[in-house]
Amino acid sequence: MRFRARTNRFHAANYLVVKAYVGVTDGNWYQFLADRPQLQEVNFWRPASAQGFRALQVGEPFFFKTHHPHNRVVGGGFFSGFARLPISEAWELLGEGNGAASEQQMREAISRYRNEPISPRDDPVIGCVFIRDTRFFDADLVAGPPPDFASNVVQGKGYDLAERAYAGYFVDLFHRLIGTDVEIDLGAPWHRAGPVYGDPRLQPQRLGQQAFKGVVLDAYQHRCAITGAKIRPVLQAAHILPLPKGGEHRLDNGLLLRSDVHIMFDRGYLSVDPKHRLLVSPRLRDDFGNGEEFYSRSGMQIVLPERKADRPHREFLAWHVDTVFKTA
């Protein structure tokens, strides 16, 4: 499906959306976030982590629907990634963006949806569906339920927007979300690689800032990509191409690194070549007289995410080697 957006300032190029998802929201979660419009990045959490979330690709729209009998679509945003995280880490990342005023309130809300209550010492892993650029509709803008959404659907339902039966409903819903007039061209084929558009909300691979941290943690299975360290408090999501240099919050622009390794990477004492092999600068020994932990790993492949699409992009790695790495 191809959309065309119009605003008062510009007539945007076509932007492309192939799917949408409508999730059933907890009423307290929705009301808490609707009262805090400044929270633009939220966690649509799931009380258990057994199932992942593959219904959308990053950048596709995610809408929030209340339970019956209210049964209205009350807002939405753009899918920004999925991660399995302990409750404490989800709270550390997003705080009130989890839909609660405190970590304890978040734990209590999650406990109500689990088969067993959460004991004070437990820190269970939950499913975190990150949504960015969220908007909750005013009372006069809430929409009725989407087509074919059965009352017994518990978590939510995905929709293929290329199907004409759903097109009109979601064009209207999309307009409510982004605040522009929308046209639709059902004859245009979907092509994932399309350009990056003027409205930053519609960039297909961009993650929210906190979602970037969460999905990098999850993709690297909470292990430093260079040392394999698993001590969670010292693990940091590093950008290969930094934001001030034009980098983005993208999973393939990220590495999970121990905090001291992160500093050495940013300063060029360490790098990773486009074949994902560790590079160690001779300057590390010259400047500090040590670094054997890293020289012993030089030339070895780093820890990588399981999915090839999530692994560091060759272009970003080549930039770091050419621009940041201290060759001598």
Give the ranges of each region predicted by the language model.
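Short, charged surface segments at domain edges that flank catalytic/cofactor-binding sites
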Residues: 46-48, 183-223, 241-252
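Polyanion-binding interface signature
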Residues: 56, 61-74, 223, 238-241
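A detector for short metal-coordination/catalytic motifs
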Residues: 207, 211, 229-235, 240-328
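Short, structured patches in soluble enzyme cores that scaffold and shape functional sites
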Residues: 132-135, 163, 228
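Short, hydrophobic/aromatic-rich beta-strand segments within well-structured domains
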Residues: 59-66, 129-130, 224-225, 256-260, ...
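Aromatic- and Lys/Arg-enriched surface recognition patch
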Residues: 72-154, 277-295
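Short, well-ordered loop/turn elements at secondary-structure boundaries
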Residues: 16-17, 57-59, 124-125, 220-221, ...
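Compositionally biased, charged N-terminal/linker segments
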Residues: 1-61, 66-68, 135, 141-153, ...
